[in-house]
Regions:
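Non-transmembrane, aqueous-exposed alpha-helical and coiled segments at domain scale
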Residues: 24-71, 82-211
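Bacterial N-terminal signal peptides
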Residues: 4-17
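Sec/Tat signal peptide C-region and signal peptidase I cleavage site
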Residues: 18-22
């Protein structure tokens, strides 16, 4: 493990031989509320082991992070963020959740409705990944995230639901299921008119902002 950490430090200094240079500027969003949503704090033992952060520090995932990852804000992205936040609160209470210690199972296959896009936001926050995830160190796969996320194609959620997700702690087996119904999110009557205009590029600047 020491060798791995030393290798990472060596690579870093090869890339930045004159020291570290911080990126300039901040992302400028068109909506102020992106940065006002309650953040989700996560402990990540892997990040500590590999030197990305000091022991006792946490990752703070914001809704703006989810928007940046998805490239947009919509009911699916918002639902993914809030569903994950609620599930973690149910599993950990007042404790800070542990990234990489959570299994996630979606009802329905990856291409069922918006399971795919929602799952990516869940992965961002929890670290749980499908077969493409980090396999961990050694034969035991320590700190691995590989296959912590699965899709249950044999059990679809309520047809009216947008998605249904089971979150389970790896350490003690405690689990909770969150079912999200996008129909409960208030919709604007203007959307039906604005969507085709925006997608076709015919929307005015004001219509694009409204959308």
């Amino acid at each position: 493990m020491l060798f791995v950490c030393m290798l990472i430090v060596w690579i870093t200094y090869c890339i930045f031989p004159c020291g570290f240079v911080r990126a300039e500027g901040q992302t400028k969003y068109s909506k102020d509320f992106f940065d006002t949503v309650e953040p989700i704090k996560m402990r990540d033992p892997l990040a500590v082991v590999l030197g990305a952060m000091d022991k006792g520090e946490v990752f703070a995932f914001t809704y703006a992070d989810a928007v940046k990852f998805a490239g947009h804000s919509c009911p699916a992205v918002a639902g993914a963020y809030k569903s994950t936040q609620m599930a973690l609160r149910a599993l950990y209470g007042d404790e800070i959740p542990v990234r990489g210690n959570i299994k996630v199972s979606f009802k329905g296959d990856v291409d069922y409705k918006v399971n795919g896009p929602i799952s990516q936001v869940v992965t961002l926050i929890t670290g749980a990944a499908p077969e493409s995830g980090f396999k961990g160190f050694g034969t035991a796969g320590k700190y691995g995230r590989y296959n912590l996320m699965t899709f249950d194609r044999d059990h679809a959620p309520d047809p009216k639901a947008t998605c249904s997700i089971v979150f389970q702690r790896v350490d003690n087996g405690k689990k909770t299921e969150v079912t999200y119904y996008v129909e409960f999110v208030p919709a604007s009557e203007r959307m039906d008119k604005l969507i085709p205009l925006v997608l076709s590029g015919k929307a005015s600047e004001d219509e694009s902002k409204e959308f």
